[in-house]
A protein has these predicted regions:
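Interdomain/boundary linker segments immediately adjacent to catalytic/signaling cores
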Residues: 1-57
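Active-site metal-binding core of divalent-cation-utilizing nuclease and nuclease-like domains
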Residues: 54-99, 146
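Structural signal for conserved beta-strand scaffold positions within catalytic alpha/beta enzyme cores
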Residues: 83, 105, 153-154
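Conserved catalytic cores of phosphodiester-cleaving nucleases, focusing on short active-site segments
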Residues: 94-110
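Short acidic-glycine loop/turn motifs at beta-strand connectors
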Residues: 98-100, 156-159, 168
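Catalytic cores of nucleic-acid endonucleases
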Residues: 110-150, 156
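A conserved mid-domain beta-alpha-beta active-site/ligand-binding segment of alpha/beta enzyme cores
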Residues: 161-235
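C-terminal, charge/polar-rich interaction regions
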Residues: 218-287
Length: 287
């Protein structure tokens, strides 16, 4: 049952729910969630109830991501939480960009450490602060397995995140090419405009190479501070649309991993404020 609830929070399901006519398979996935609430309660309240059950009985990666985002934004409300960011040869589970930026790799009790070395190497090329998030039971193993500059956060039995070891910052591990590749073209241009007054002076086909050459001439500490500024401001319109939609707190990680139009976010918000009874299905969820 709890796995069915976890499936309802996937970005694939949530994206489908934002469409004008969600497919039957998505409605079936949501049916297990809707059944948890009084039929007249909003579907969003049912998602919050389902999430509470996941926290209590099935601490999957989604739970770790959501609690990490909530805790990070409580500490720094103006920060930006990004989910599933490609970084060098890996994909960071969560990146939080505020006054500083931190890349987080989540290892639940269902995960192995087999790829951890490569993942941490990738993140360390782009972020001063890198952390691994594990259950309390895996803290000692994580402390022994990761480099000394990598922080370790523990997810305890009360669903709180505590710091077993803070990360160690510094620019020496950063790679300018990796920083450049994480940034989008508009972000690169914004950095170069602020730093050297640059505006595009070559055809679009040559702009990547031209901006790369100019970016590499920046001092690493300057480039990194600008990198953090751009990540903090990334997808600001998306975040405004998410806030306007009034999504339930339990949807934080799903929303952070999606890019939708403003209309689609509004449609999703309307759906989650509608009665749960509309999403009860007699057929069982698809496998």
């Amino acid at each position: 049952m709890v796995r069915e609830l976890a499936n309802a929070f996937s970005t694939r399901v949530v994206r489908e729910l934002s469409r004008p006519q969600p497919a039957l398979w998505a409605r079936q996935r949501v049916s297990a969630v809707a059944a948890l609430a009084d039929p007249d309660m909003p579907l969003g309240a049912a998602f919050d109830t389902a999430y509470s059950q996941l926290v209590a009985a099935y601490r999957c990666e989604y739970v770790f991501k959501t609690e990490l985002i909530h805790q990070s934004l409580r500490a720094e409300p103006t920060a930006n939480a990004l989910v599933g960011m490609p970084v060098f040869t890996s994909i960071a589970d969560v990146v939080v960009a505020g006054q500083t930026a931190t890349a987080f790799e989540i290892k639940t009790d269902l995960d192995s450490f087999s790829r951890l070395e490569l993942q941490l190497f990738s993140y360390s090329r782009c972020f001063e602060n890198v952390c691994v998030v594990v259950s309390a039971e895996k803290v000692d193993r994580a402390l022994a397995a990761v480099p000394e500059h990598v922080g370790v956060w523990a997810f305890d039995s009360g669903a709180d995140l505590t710091t077993a070891r803070p990360p160690t910052g510094g620019y020496s591990r950063l790679d300018m090419t990796s920083l450049f590749r994480v940034l989008r073209q508009g972000e690169r241009l914004a950095v170069l405009r602020r730093q050297i007054g640059y505006t595009a002076d070559v055809p679009s086909a040559l702009l990547y190479r031209r901006t790369a050459e100019l970016f590499m001439d920046l001092r690493v500490e300057v480039a990194y501070d600008e990198f953090v500024v751009e990540l903090r401001g990334r997808d600001a319109r998306q975040r405004a649309a998410i806030r306007a939609a009034g999504l339930p707190n339990s949807m934080a990680a799903a929303a952070a991993g999606l890019v939708l139009s403003r209309v689609a976010w509004r449609r999703l918000g309307d759906l989650l404020h509608s009665p749960a009874r509309q999403y009860l299905c007699s057929s069982s969820p698809a496998a």
